[in-house]
């Protein structure tokens, strides 16, 4: 019995890299295709998010986003049915657009973006229009 090989196989079954093949925005879940498993498609997987109780973030990866998934160990008997999408990651195929570690930026396919430089400047660009709603807005 090759214990090292068995452990590596179990780890590869728990942590898997795949590509998002469909998105369910209502349930905040995705299906993921695993090319290394003959394009096997997962059940709908929940996405790990920032905040999920009173302060909530909403972000679902787009179709074709490369993601890292974590599945419950096979010994539980559930395989690719019970797991989570931990998130997307940069790669040669999908490199970051920013390289400054102080910058926080969200860019959208239409050209809109929100960028904070970490030094006090926030740049917001909306491709069509920008809506601000508040009882009072101060611009100086």
Where are these regions (language model features)?
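Hydrophobic packing positions characteristic
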Residues: 1-133
């Amino acid at each position: 019995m090759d214990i090292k090989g068995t452990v590596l196989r179990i780890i590869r079954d728990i942590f898997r890299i795949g590509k998002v093949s469909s998105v369910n925005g209502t349930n905040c879940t995705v299906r993921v295709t695993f090319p290394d498993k003959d394009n096997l498609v997962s059940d709908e997987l929940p996405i790990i998010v920032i905040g999920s109780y009173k302060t909530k973030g909403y972000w679902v990866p787009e179709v074709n986003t490369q993601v890292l998934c974590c599945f419950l160990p096979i010994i539980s008997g559930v395989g690719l049915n019970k797991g989570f999408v931990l998130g997307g990651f940069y790669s040669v195929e999908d490199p970051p657009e920013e390289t400054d570690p102080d910058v926080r930026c969200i860019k959208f396919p239409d050209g809109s973006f929100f960028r904070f430089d970490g030094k006090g400047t926030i740049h917001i660009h909306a491709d069509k229009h920008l809506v601000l709603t508040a009882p009072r807005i101060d611009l100086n």
